[in-house]
Amino acid sequence: IITIEDPVEIKQDNMLQLQLNPSIGMTYDHLIKLSLRHRPDVLIIGEIRDRETAQAVIRASLTGIRVFSTVHAKSIPGVYARILELGVSQDELDNCLAGIAYQRLIGGGGLIDFAQDHFQNHQAECWNEKIGQLLAAGHLTEEEAAAEKIKD
């Protein structure tokens, strides 16, 4: 496993961790190319922020290496749209994207309180109720709410 981060936040002894340093040419693009020479099983890229990084991540993925990264977006469809906005072609994205895991920050008491109140009791209806409240308050669109709801 090779990680490319800016900065390396948590040191992991069982991974090769590379940190960006653009002042000496250590960009995402350069470090991704460098890491491909090592043929890792998994490549973790800190964040896709620009066209150069998006293209490099897609190239790495198309070599058959499993690549994980983050993209800031407001919804699952927004992730897809954001990658297309960064110059990745529809065909490239269709050939390399295996899935999207999406998380939303929850306002209020915090994640631990929310998880204890809702998930430990396996209460999907509580989650769906909260999604409905967020929709009613204008924090979610109809599309986002439908994507977030837990289906039976």
Where are these predicted regions, by residue range?
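Short, flexible helix-loop junctions that flank or precede catalytic/ligand sites
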Residues: 1-152
